[in-house]
Amino acid sequence: NSVLKAQYHLNVTTGEVLFTDLIPVQQISAPTGATHVSLSCEFLNLDLETDVKALQISPVTNLPLNSLATNVTLTPPATATGTGTGINFYFLKIAFFQDFNEIQYTLNNGAYNALQLIEII
């Protein structure tokens, strides 16, 4: 059972993740009670020999769980270069929320959220 059932494109140079025509209610398996989903990506360069690391996190994109097709672009603010000799790790994070009186609350203290390693180079 996968949380995300949508295709995406990862640009390994910039760390950008692109979803074309994402339909949240059809392509994201949300827990009962969720009204919104947040997506972000992370780009980590880690040099295992020197322990030098650089992490870049994209701004969060928050969407209602509806049937509207939406293009989503998750772009880290900079390239995670570290020393330039490390390993690049690419992550995708999905978090669920419930809207109550126009305030979004995390469901069950984040127990339904997912962080997936999507590529290593």
List where the protein language model places each region.
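Internal, hydrophobic beta-strand segments that form the core of beta-sheet-rich folds
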Residues: 36-46, 84-111
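Short helix-loop boundary/capping segments
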Residues: 23-62
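A beta-strand/beta-hairpin structural motif
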Residues: 56-82
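Contiguous beta-strand segments within globular domains
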Residues: 7-25, 30
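Intrinsically disordered, low-complexity segments enriched in serine, threonine, and glycine
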Residues: 51, 66, 79-81, 86, ...
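N-terminal "mature-chain" segments and other terminal, solvent-exposed stretches
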Residues: 1-5
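Surface-exposed coil/turn segments at beta-strand junctions on protein surfaces, enriched
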Residues: 12, 32, 65-69, 85-87
